[in-house]
Amino acid sequence: MSEKDFVQVAKLGKTVGLKGYVKLHNLSDFSSQFKKDATFFIKNTKEMLKIKHYNASNSTVLFENYEDIEKAKELTNLILFQSIEKSRQTCKLKKDEFFYFDILECEVFEEDKRLGKVVDILETGASYLFEIQSDEKWVEKKYPKIFFIPYLDKFVKNIDIEKRQIFCTQDAFLILENS
């Protein structure tokens, strides 16, 4: 499996108490994946961590083989990864919800005009913004290389994950023009 097959799900913080618990900073929208016996990968290693206990109320986690404070200190600042395949199995989406990794790299269209592709998703307080890398033909015409489309019904009509396409309203090209 390549790095593209994995997604960041959490960052581990400082130790809490003397028994090996560490603070877990959830980087996903799915806290349900952090439960007893769940396993995660550590970046740039083949090591897997298995949860022995997770306390949701204070976001602390205890991993097998790290059950004392000195051993647990080794985990501070590590990033936990989950395979995309396992994320699909354990994280249930509601209607019209999508995984970030499914949205990234989708082509963005307004009618038959290809505007560009999604390169990042930013969270604002109220909604999400799709960061779009403009299609080369728009850059050649002196439009910006990057622009943002809010993930709101007013701008996004349809997302087709299978075709990796996002269809926007007429206001999307207006955003590109005025960026």
From Swiss-Prot:
Keywords: Chaperone, Cytoplasm, Ribosome biogenesis, rRNA processing. GO terms for molecular function: ribosome binding. It is found in: Cytoplasm. Gene3D superfamilies: PRC-barrel domain, RimM. The keyword Chaperone applies. Signal peptide: none annotated. One of its GO terms (cellular component) is cytoplasm. One of its GO terms (biological process) is rRNA processing. It comes from the Bacteria. Its main location: cytoplasm. Belongs to the RimM family. Binds ribosomal protein uS19. An accessory protein needed during the final step in the assembly of 30S ribosomal subunit, possibly for assembly of the head region. Essential for efficient processing of 16S rRNA. May be needed both before and after RbfA during the maturation of 16S rRNA. It has affinity for free ribosomal 30S subunits but not for 70S ribosomes. The PRC barrel domain binds ribosomal protein uS19. This is Ribosome maturation factor RimM. The gene is rimM.
